[in-house]
Amino acid sequence: MPESICVLRLSAIGDCCHTLPVVRTLQSAFPKSPITWVIGTTEHKLLEGSDGIEFITFDKSDGFSSWKNLRRQFAGKQFSVLLNMNASMRANMVSTAIPALRRIGFDRARARDFQWAFSNERIAERHPDRRHVLDGLFQFAEYLGVTDRQMRWDITLSDADRQLALDVTSGPGPTCVISPCSSQRARNFRNWSIDKYLELIDYLQNQYGAQVLLTGAPTDIEKHYAQEILARTGNTVTSLIGKTTLKELLAVIDAAKLVICPDSGPAHMATAVATPVIGLYATSNPERTGPYNDQQLVANRYPEAIEQEFGKSVSEVRFGQRVRSPEAMDLISVADVTAKVDAVLG
């Protein structure tokens, strides 16, 4: 049994949601071993207060200064085990500020950005090769001899978080949360079109009398989506875009009957609170990054996008291969999504 465990997973929201049940599993297996988690400041805002976990935040925007702060916080301390569950050069640098006897990283094939050079032990190679990100993270627990998974998240929410959610979901009809946009990165085309969202909203309202809530961050693209959708639906939709904290958003998702979103954090937040989620996937493989417990609800046009982009089948390309085409998400039809809606609300 390790005397102490440090988990290093800085980001992003979805991946930290994947990491949490692994940490819960380690807590169950090693109840006397304190667990520290080095996490990004944004992600900490969602997971803050999770029982039995000491969080140490790292501000990615503050770079070297944050690294020095970590060094100071860990001065005189040594962990039995460091689980570096974040294969990136930034995480590699952060790991050098964490004193640990055993420094466990990914196997060579998954140890991106030379992570293998910052580890002295590695988890087993992935077999079968095509596994969900969450399954890959559970290999860290398995490496420590723990195979009994605890698929629980138990993210702490306040009474105020719950009350806000109750206030915005108490209208007639089922509450459907639409988080229309993913985080914006270069050549990362994951967003469905506004026109298709409008058709979907019309179906939700007319077929099920649904109360539709838009959620998201206050980015320019998300605010644009909200403005267009509100204007073209006659304000029959409520926009919470840029108006909630992450914990408030989780409470809203928990209170909703359904979440619809592209490959993004809210898909995995919904998984954490067992709210059905329809994932919109064409540019990334849902077998790897889809909502873990709702694969059957994914509107999946990834195979068609791969064929269109590479002239190959999914099995012929690298697992996790991205499609960098701005047209790929248009392969998902409104009918693809309404069929999944009917499976949940019908």
What are these regions (language model features)?
Residues 1-346:
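Catalytic machinery of carbohydrate-active enzymes
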